[in-house]
Every structure is written in structure tokens, then in C-alpha cells.
Amino acid sequence: MNAKKQSRIRRATRSRSKIRELRETRLCVNRTPRHIYAQIISPESDKVLASASTLDKDLRSGATGNIDAATAVGKLIAERAKAAGVTKVAFDRSGFKFHGRVKALADAARESGLEF
């Protein structure tokens, strides 16, 4: 594994351990060069309460690997989280920089009603 990926995984592990101490529901984001994924995860049992990605049928017709797609995923995950009864989350960026697609997803989720 290269040093850049090791550094990202180390950052992700550190932030996840801090979020676990808070005992709060988390919004976990993962990105690949082609897609972006978001999950709402319960603090008690690590159970997925809601999820959204660019692979969903609702979003598949549009672009998949850009900021517009990340914004659409952010709006969709916020809607699904509210439907599951979640309004407040801790943002888990999985060690990625808070920039570009990750930031676009977070901003869209905030605008759609999630608090973090």
C-alpha cells in the first residue's frame, strides 16, 4: 500500500475513534475516481440506517464522478436520513480532504436539513 493511502487510512481511523467516543450517528463518505457513496451509520451497532450513491437508480442517469453528482448524493442522503428519523450526525470524511466532491456532498446535506 502506498504512503498516501496509508496516511488517509490512518486519518480515517483516528477520526472514527473520536466519533465513536461521541456516541453519535455518523454520515460516512467514501469516494472513488468514478463514484461517491454516503451512509448514515448507527452508533450502537454499526448498522446502516440510510445510504445513497451515484449508483442509485435515481442518480444513475447523470454524471457520476463530479461535484454535481456529489451534490445530488448529499441531497438524497439527507432526505433518506430524515425519513429514517435522523436529523443530527457526525461527519466522517474517511480521511479524505474536506474539498471538492466531499465538501459538495456535505454542503448539500446541510442545506437539505442535516445538522453536523
From Swiss-Prot:
Keywords: Ribonucleoprotein, Ribosomal protein, RNA-binding, rRNA-binding
MF-aspect GO terms: 5S rRNA binding; structural constituent of ribosome
Single biological process term from Gene Ontology: translation
Gene Ontology CC terms: cytosolic large ribosomal subunit
CDD domains: Ribosomal_L18_L5e (cd00432)
Highest rank taxon of the organism: Bacteria
Stored HAMAP family: Ribosomal_uL18_B
Subunit description: Part of the 50S ribosomal subunit; part of the 5S rRNA/L5/L18/L25 subcomplex. Contacts the 5S and 23S rRNAs.
Protein family per UniProt: Belongs to the universal ribosomal protein uL18 family.
Physiological role: This is one of the proteins that bind and probably mediate the attachment of the 5S RNA into the large ribosomal subunit, where it forms part of the central protuberance.
Name assigned to this protein: Large ribosomal subunit protein uL18
